[in-house]
């Protein structure tokens, strides 16, 4: 996967994305991620890879200072159309090269983005950089099982799935290890499909 290809494939995905990833099991999973989260009035939130804005619909947007970025202009248009009455700033931006100052945000939401970007370690590095001290990164994504080899079938289909803009063979532990001195995992729980999808909360 690379950014150029991701822009192409998510242009294709944008008209139908919500049918697959903001309904049914995925909608239930997203709600489960946000159900027990609370935000303080005026907090600065950054949605990295906001997509069509599915997560924006699950929070009280009026009391928060929200910025949302995505590499795909087509996905951003979908997100902004859902949030016309809220003061959210939308930017087309590479999640691996965030154009924000250090320690700018209280909370970062990263749903289905680490498994999409070409360099997930760079993405996490950038999120850590722009996160304030004592801030949190909330991750909802699919990862390979901890300390287990990827099942044979997934190893076979992984290259094909990557063509559609995502990676089913990513180990979160491999991404996180480099930043374990500055970040702490507060929560890591299975959310969907026997733990393939997880909710992970990281604190700086």
Question: Model-found features: residue ranges?
Answer:
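A short SAM/SAH-binding and catalytic strip from SAM-dependent methyltransferases
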Residues: 107-119
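Class I SAM-dependent methyltransferase SAM/SAH-binding core
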Residues: 44-97
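C-terminal lobe and adjacent flexible extensions of AdoMet/dcAdoMet transferase-like proteins
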Residues: 199-204
């Amino acid at each position: 996967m690379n950014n150029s290809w991701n822009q192409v494939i998510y242009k294709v995905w944008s008209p139908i994305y919500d049918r697959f990833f903001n309904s049914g099991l995925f909608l239930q999973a997203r709600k489960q991620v946000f159900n027990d989260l609370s935000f303080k009035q005026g907090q600065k939130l950054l949605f990295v890879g906001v997509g069509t804005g599915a997560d924006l619909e699950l929070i009280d947007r009026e009391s928060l200072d929200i910025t949302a970025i995505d590499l795909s202009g087509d996905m951003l248009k979908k997100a902004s159309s859902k949030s016309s009455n809220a003061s959210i700033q939308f930017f087309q931006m590479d999640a691996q090269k965030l154009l924000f100052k250090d320690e700018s945000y209280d909370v970062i939401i990263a749903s289905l983005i680490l498994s999409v970007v070409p360099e997930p370690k760079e993405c996490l590095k950038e999120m850590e950089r722009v996160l304030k001290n004592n801030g949190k990164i909330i991750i909802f994504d699919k990862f390979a099982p901890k300390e287990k080899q990827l099942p044979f079938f997934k190893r076979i289909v992984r290259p094909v799935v990557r063509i559609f803009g995502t990676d089913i063979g990513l180990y979160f532990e491999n991404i996180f290890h480099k930043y374990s001195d500055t970040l702490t995992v507060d929560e890591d729980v299975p959310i969907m499909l026997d733990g393939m999808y997880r909710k992970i909360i990281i604190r700086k």
